Amino acid sequence: MISSVKLNLILVLSLSTMHVFWCYPVPSSKVSGKSDYFLILLNSCPTRLDRSKELAFLKPILEKMFVKRSFRNGVGTGMKKTSFQRAKS
């Protein structure tokens, strides 16, 4: 049991640090005129380039969560009924 816990811990740690291995620094010969290695690291990192693609799969789920429920009588739609609308319905 302890070995399976260790294995799970190693698996979780390796998956959580995988983005670090994708962001390897570019050698200075490939970058002309830049000496700041931190900027080179950020420029070579694919996860830093576009965060919208990374979270695109969550967009439909989040949209469904925040859609207000609407009923025929207007409850939940956020609209305020006037006396004419109440008499009409």
Curated annotation (Swiss-Prot):
The keyword Signal applies. Its main location: secreted. Keywords: Cleavage on pair of basic residues, Neuropeptide, Secreted, Signal. Pfam families: Neuropeptide_S. It is found in: Secreted. Residues 1-23 form the signal peptide. GO terms for biological process: neuropeptide signaling pathway; positive regulation of action potential; positive regulation of circadian sleep/wake cycle, wakefulness; positive regulation of synaptic transmission, GABAergic; positive regulation of synaptic transmission, glutamatergic; synaptic transmission, glutamatergic; visual learning. GO terms for cellular component: extracellular region; synapse. Coiled coil: none annotated. It comes from the Eukaryota. InterPro entries: Neuropeptide_S (IPR028138). Residues 24-67 form a propeptide. PANTHER family: NEUROPEPTIDE S. Modulates arousal and anxiety. May play an important anorexigenic role. Binds to its receptor NPSR1 with nanomolar affinity to increase intracellular calcium concentrations. This is Neuropeptide S. It comes from Homo sapiens.
